[in-house]
UniProtKB/Swiss-Prot annotation:
Catalytic activity: CMP + ATP = CDP + ADP; dCMP + ATP = dCDP + ADP
Record-given protein name: Cytidylate kinase
GO cellular component: cytosol
InterPro entries: Cytidylate_kin (IPR003136), Cytidylate_kinase_dom (IPR011994), P-loop_NTPase (IPR027417)
Pfam assignment, any one: Cytidylate_kin
Species of origin: Chlorobaculum tepidum (strain ATCC 49652 / DSM 12025 / NBRC 103806 / TLS) (Chlorobium tepidum)
UniProt keyword list: ATP-binding, Cytoplasm, Kinase, Nucleotide-binding, Transferase
Top enzyme class: transferase
Amino acid sequence: MESPIEKKPIIVAIDGPAASGKSTTAKILAARLGYTYIDTGAMYRSVTLKVLREGLLDEIRKDETRIAELLQTITIGFQGQRVFLDGEDVSEAIRENRVSREVSFISSLKPVRDKLRELQQEMGRKRGIVMDGRDIGTVIFPDAELKIFLIADPAERAKRRHAELLLKAGGAAVPSVEALEEEIKQRDRDDEQRTHAPLKRHPDAVLLDTSNMTIDEQVNVVYDLVNKIVEQQSL
């Protein structure tokens, strides 16, 4: 027998700044709900990686229209939690620090946002999805049944990012917590001040401060909210 969550799948939009816990929360939540997880940040990182690999960054800084040609041929897809760019698994490559430094700029470009918005909206047509990013609740799915906006103190977010990088570094040097905190603060400024789809909370979004929360606590809060919405729809 199907549960209410399976009978009436909804769209869960999770927004927030870098390292606020969006992706981890969204992945675990989607698995728990039996929903599809779509990592929009990975999509922007994939475009950024392609720009860097093709050596187009300086050209695009001078002339943003140069990116349009690249977007015509790019393919981005997911298999489970693996990310594929033009058929290649780039799940680790898109997390490189050089990508992190440039993704805010690439994300600010209108042709990029238009192209990825189209892809993301197509992915969400069947509902039963959890999507995280920076403009999901405001631009991609403003009518999502549940919109969450995660925040956390920049210092705490830097510690999380540092721990994540150490885990993946295999003994290689990683940026200091202090350097990462400055990078995160700059990223916040870039995301909030960009012309196209700046980072902001939708008026209907539930604000959740994750500074002192574990991942399990974050997931439980959002899972309970999904249940409440589905139960109300079933009445």
